[in-house]
Swiss-Prot record:
Enzyme class: hydrolase
Family: Belongs to the glutaminase family.
Chain's gene name: glsA
Listed name of the protein: Glutaminase
Chain coiled-coil ranges: none
This protein's UniProt keywords: Hydrolase
Subunit architecture: Homotetramer.
PANTHER family in the cross-refs: GLUTAMINASE
Organism: Clostridium botulinum (strain Kyoto / Type A2)
EC number(s) stated in the UniProt entry for this protein: 3.5.1.2
Record keyword Cell cycle present: no
Length: 305
């Protein structure tokens, strides 16, 4: 497996030149464009990795699957999806278009920024600190890594420059789609996106989902089976933003990307995969990371379709 991973990384390194690091968050623009790594965890608990698999980077939008799991556990799926939809979108992850166009004004799915902000508001906690503390502890639990923490520099950078997210949140507040204190909810959202992880952490989260919510390391149920199923389904339809259909055709497994360059993926009942490739395509997905997953999926016949 390690030889295969090494070959796949080298085969797809050339794609880095066609992408660029996220620049709209100043701290992210400082990232090394050439980082490339992969980690794979099997249902048998075996781990393989190559490249920059132990380099820390911020989770960004991959945190949306973490908070979605937590919100469903806290509130039940019916309540959560009464506040946010579950349909794919052809618009960008930070677009306001669908919020204005739809009569209900509720966000179209939990993987776009507007939807994730509403989901963050549904995580239980008496204040923003308690909500984020629960998100952080849950991230540690599902990854099996108690050392995961927030990158304060990225958090401050996001908070200072997150004008589009503020606009989305205040627009939803004005239509009644978002309840609660907007700045407190945004604080939770900016913090959750600034959690620092590695490819290895992502692969462990992926394998937990691949195993229907059960840790292959301990045998403990971490997430209810129906929650894992819902999240994997949303990952297939919406996880790669407005490139989700293309990803489903060419790679065919549940996945979620983040503008930090990470992608978490899972091949149900087979393996979890974590990829880092900081150079992004025009959709905000890791360009080399996506190509790595495409080659891995073809080599191991991972597609669920």
């Amino acid at each position: 497996m390690n030889r295969l991973l090494k070959t796949i990384i080298e085969n797809n390194r050339k794609w880095i030149s066609e992408g660029k690091v996220a620049s709209y968050i100043p701290e992210l623009s400082k990232m090394d464009k050439n980082l490339l790594g992969i980690s794979v965890c099997t249902l048998g608990g075996e781990e393989y990795w190559e490249g920059d698999a132990e380099v820390k980077f911020t989770i960004q939008s991959i945190s949306k699957i973490v908070t979605l799991m937590l919100a469903i556990i806290d509130n039940g799926e019916d309540y959560v999806f009464s506040k946010v939809g579950m349909e794919p979108t052809e618009t960008a992850f930070n677009s306001i278009v669908n919020l204005e166009a739809k009569e209900s004004h509720k966000p179209i799915n939990p993987m776009i920024n507007a939807g994730a902000i509403v989901v963050a508001s549904m995580v239980a906690g008496k204040d923003s600190d308690e909500k984020f503390d629960r998100i952080l502890k849950f991230t540690r639990k599902i990854s099996g890594n108690n050392n995961i923490d927030i990158n304060l520099n990225v958090y401050k950078s996001e908070k200072e420059t997150g004008h589009r997210n503020r606009a989305l949140a205040y627009f939803m507040k004005s239509t009644g789609a978002l309840k609660g204190n907007v700045e407190e909810i945004l604080d939770v959202y900016f913090k959750q996106c600034s959690i620092e992880i590695t490819c290895k952490d992502l692969a462990r989260i992926g394998v937990m989902l691949a195993n229907d919510g059960v840790s292959p390391y301990t045998g403990d149920r971490i997430v209810p089976r129906h929650v894992a199923r819902i999240v994997k389904t949303i990952m297939v339809t919406c996880g790669m933003y407005d490139a989700s259909g293309n990803f489903a055709v060419h790679i065919g497994i549940p996945a979620k990307s983040g503008v930090g360059g990470g992608i978490v993926a899972c091949a149900p009942r087979r393996m979890g995969i974590g990829v880092l490739g900081t150079a992004l395509d025009e959709k905000g997905n890791s360009i080399a990371g996506t190509k790595i997953l495409e080659e891995l999926s073809k080599q191991l016949d991972l597609s669920i379709f």
